[in-house]
Amino acid sequence: MQLKGSKTHQALKDAFAGESQANRRYLYFAAKADVEGQNDIAAVFRSTAEGETGHAHGHLEYLESCGDPATNLPFGKSRDNLKSAIAGETHEYTDMYPGMAKTARAEGFAEIADWFETLAKAERSHANRFQKALDVLAD
């Protein structure tokens, strides 16, 4: 049976998303613990975040044969990774964040809408940086 399109493929994508989010949450929690002067707690969160990164990378190893879980584009080699990153960042600055900003503004969350609009600009910059790297990539 082929992995791509299977329930196991979806499980790997879901697991990758969950582990990735756990990593970022734990790093955020570690920063909060640092502010509170809870150095031991911060260290626990940081070391656990690193473990979650290992789990996420393991999922990506299996997903390489199926395509990037965010863009469905091939990934693994630098050229493919850059193309996938450009596609992901482009989606974020052209569709995702502008749509989120519009919704937030319509619901009366102007500050959050402004935040989303700021992020759209940052994502455009990221896409441009990846494009420049792709343009000079030697084969």
What name fits each language-model region?
Residues 1-139:
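Non-heme di-metal
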